[in-house]
Every structure is written in structure tokens, then in C-alpha cells.
């Protein structure tokens, strides 16, 4: 095989549940585009200009109409690899999300921007919306990058924080809790239950929130606030799942709804009541 044929060899990659088929070509990734692609590309360029070097560079559109991004070498954290629940991983993820939020706070919003969803009030930052293990790349157990930016949109910091905490703390019932949350469609990417005790989960949540805030006391959110935001965040996931054709995905939606109700009922302690308002277009 010569260098030219090696360069055009397309290697299918796992994932692509939102964007469709994803392939690796050389040291790049090729992905289908959508109406939001130009806005997302502008966002990624802004992030890198702000020093967020763990998001891929954009290299334009190929001859097949697909976007061209850097390929980030490593493994995507599907399932429960040993490093996923380390405290070091938890704090790293919180700090990376803080970097993302701070950088996107200065992103220039334009009237012709297109997002997957108009957004949520208050539109403090551009939320990744799916900042979760299955969209994170690790190398030797260390976070090295994030992928999949198709569903980004403006929103509150806590909208993002709630879902990331749900996945990484995790904010899910104990394996022995009586919560009607099954079955789910893909246990390799859904940590639907945990063996952490309630005190352990709350301690991990406090660690996550402290790492996100750093030295900024104004961003040290109380656990009750994050838990409050987790309720509508999971309801949004459930609503999206309910609208899908796949019965398996709708099963997954039942899990999100059951977990939202469990958190709202105090499964992890007091949760503030949050009324979420969509941005108007």
C-alpha cells in the first residue's frame, strides 16, 4: 500500500449516534455536517484561540461534504474503565468544563448562529450539553480531549454541570435502591446504578463542585442547586429519548425520567426547584 492509498483509507470509528457515520482518514476525522456546523466550527476556533487545546482543530470540509477535524489519539471512555472513577479524573473533568465555560463566555454571538437547540436561560456560556465519558478521550487513563460538539447551545453553567456530574459522580441510585429505571439500551455507556454509598456520592459531588469553582467563590455552587438543575436536565434527556423511533432508546428515556423523579424526591438530598426557560429565537 503506497502513502497515497493509506491516506485515503477510511477507518470506521465507534460512535456517531448524533451525527451519523464517523471515519478516520490519516490523522483526521471525517463527520457528516448539519445546519449548525458553521457555528460549531467558529466556536471550536474560538476555544482554541482562548487556549483550550484539548478540542480538535477544524480543517474545513472534504470532497464528500464532511467536516474534517483533528483525530485525538486515545480511547473513548465507554463502560467503566478503572480510571473513570478516580478522584483525579473527577477533578480534571470539572476543571476542563470550567475552562470550556470560561472560554465560551467570550464567544461572539451572531444573529445567524445555528444551534442544535435555541438554548436555555440564562445563556451564560455555550454549553457542550453532552460533556460525558462517551465523548471524552483518554490516554493512559488521563483525559486528553473532548469530541462531538453537534448539540452545543447557549445556556447556564449549571445545565452542563448537572449532566456531567450525573455521569461522573455519578448522580444515580445505588444498586439496591428501589427505583424503576430499567431496562436501558446500552450498558456500555450508561452507568445506571452505582455501588457508592450516599455519603460517598455526596462527597464526590462536593469535590466536583469545588474543583469547578477553583478560587472563584461565586462559582462554588451548592449541591442543592446542582441537584435542582439535574432534574430538568434529565427530563430533557427523557423527552428527547421519548421522541425517537427506537424502542431501546425510549427505554433509556424511562431511566432518565425515573432518575429525575428520584433526585427531585430527595434521593441525593435537598434539590432546589428550578424552572427552566428556553431561549426565544
Predicted features along the sequence, with ranges:
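ATP/Mg2+ or Mg2+-diphosphate-binding catalytic cores
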Residues: 233-281
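Active-site activation/catalytic loop segments of kinase-like enzymes and analogous catalytic loops
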Residues: 161-214, 231-243
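Amphipathic alpha-helical interface surfaces
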Residues: 93-96, 139, 157-160, 201-208
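Eukaryotic Ser/Thr/Pro-rich intrinsically disordered, low-complexity regulatory regions
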Residues: 219-223
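Actinobacteria-biased recognition of intrinsically disordered, low-complexity terminal regions
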Residues: 1-18, 265-281
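ATP-binding pocket architecture of kinase catalytic cores
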Residues: 9-128, 132, 138-142
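Catalytic activation segment of kinase domains across protein kinase-like and atypical kinase folds
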Residues: 116, 125, 132-175
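Soluble or luminal CAZymes and related metallo-dependent hydrolases
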Residues: 39, 89-92, 200-204, 255
